[in-house]
Amino acid sequence: MVNVKKGVLVTSDPAFRQLLIHLDDSRQLGSKFIVRELDDTHLFIEKEIVPMLENKVEQIMENMNPEAVDK
């Protein structure tokens, strides 16, 4: 049997990859979104989650360094 999913290949440094894994494990976006962990710098994630993931990462970055955010 073959399963097919539309997804996006994400390339990142290992630290950001760990952040994505944490968001996935804690289901902070409502559900798990990582389809497959490929290696230390690549993840395959569900395509539909990308806009929500971008917003969540932007929110995290703003909270970490509010002065660096363009207003």
UniProtKB/Swiss-Prot annotation:
Protein's GO biological process: nucleotide-excision repair; nucleotide-excision repair, preincision complex assembly; transcription by RNA polymerase II; transcription initiation at RNA polymerase II promoter
Consequence of gene disruption: Auxin-induced degradation of the protein causes no obvious phenotype in germ cells and early embryos.
Localization of this protein: Nucleus; Chromosome
Domain of life: Eukaryota
Keyword Cell wall biogenesis/degradation: no
DNA repair among keywords: yes
InterPro entries: TFB5-like_sf, TFIIH_TTDA/Tfb5
Its biological purpose: Component of the general transcription and DNA repair factor IIH (TFIIH) core complex, which is involved in general and transcription-coupled nucleotide excision repair (NER) of damaged DNA and in RNA transcription by RNA polymerase II. In NER, TFIIH acts by opening DNA around the lesion to allow the excision of the damaged oligonucleotide and its replacement by a new DNA fragment. In transcription, TFIIH has an essential role in transcription initiation. When the pre-initiation complex (PIC) has been established, TFIIH is required for promoter opening and promoter escape.
Protein's organism: Caenorhabditis elegans
Keywords (A to Z) from UniProt: Chromosome, DNA damage, DNA repair, Nucleus, Transcription, Transcription regulation
One GO cellular component, as annotated: transcription factor TFIIH core complex
One Pfam entry name: Tfb5
Record-linked SMART domains: Tbf5 (SM01395)
Family in the record: Belongs to the TFB5 family.
Quaternary assembly: Component of the 7-subunit TFIIH core complex.
Protein name, UniProt field: General transcription and DNA repair factor IIH subunit TFB5
